[in-house]
Amino acid sequence: MIYNRLKRFSLSTLVIAVCLLISSCGSDSSDAKKQMKAKADLQGAVIGVQLGTTSDGLATELEKKGDGTKVERYNKGADAIQALLQGKIDCMVTDEAPAKAFQRVNPSLQILPETFDASSFAICVAKDHGELKQSINHAIRILKANGVIDSIVNRHLERGIAVAYTPKTSAGKLNSSSDAPHPSDAKKMGPEALQKLGLKKSLRFATNATFEPFEYYQNGKIVGIDVDVANAIGDVLGVDVEILDMEFDAIITSVQAGKADAGIAGITVTPEREKNIGFTDSYADVRQVIMVNSGDAKAADAQQGFVDKFKSCFIDDNRYQYMLQGLGNTLIITFFAIIL
């Protein structure tokens, strides 16, 4: 009898505790209530960025001015978006293409019309692999001249196609009847040339597959603009391509250490990065934008699904630790209250 009463009470206590914790999610938001309408409003704002990106570097320069601007850094862009939806930050600075991808699934998000900064993406290569850099530059020039890169970018951005380029098989035939253009009359590098450079039989590209539409997962496979560009480069050079997913901050280090041959992950050339790594010619021009939440934090929180809300607030925010501690104390008190 006592055991059944204790069991029922424990279950009830657990359910109540979880519900209270989940319902409190979002209530610990910071004072991120600044109205964001233009670039000038970044002064004194709480800015969210993905750690190690160009956006991080640009926002950090604003933070250094000492005018109250604060930068919150996240391992993934999606984490920064979640913070924006919950009202924990005033805005997020990121590239326009991924900003539009986030906006498609979060209608309350708004991209301010004013450009925050303009930049270009390039592929990073170890400084002692000058011949590989020249070969990739050769491929980029061909792909630009043939309109292949423009086609890849447009098909992703305008038509929302996850795979806009179909690489050739080892037999030299297309895997499907894709309508995307393919390079022709290209000077092949071949696996033998790769081996002479001390590289593997395939060209290994490091990326960070959390940056839609440039690189992300769909149905368990890494897809996106950068993946298609990498495969097209492989076709020009006559080599197979391997895509390696890793944290963004690890890409340059991995290329330096030879764990990857090149890095393609929406990487902007900066003087700081050029101290440690080499860069190819640019293959895409982009602009940095400011993204804000046009609705209030409560409305965005209400739109969040139960499972997502449970994970972000109960697991990611470590609230389960408080619940377990409190539940343990409650059970001890309850146990002695019942038996006495």
Language-model segments: which ranges?
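Immediate post-signal peptide segment of exported/extracytoplasmic ligand-binding proteins
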Residues: 31-46, 167-221, 298-299
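Transmembrane alpha-helix signature in integral membrane proteins
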Residues: 321-340
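Extracytoplasmic small-molecule ligand-binding "clamshell" domains
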Residues: 70-74, 185-266
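Periplasmic-binding protein-like
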Residues: 96, 100-140, 160-178, 209, ...
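C-terminal motif of bacterial Sec signal peptides marking the signal peptidase cleavage site
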Residues: 21-24
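Ligand-binding clefts/hinges and TM-proximal coupling segments of bilobed small-molecule sensing domains
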Residues: 56-63, 67, 71, 111, ...
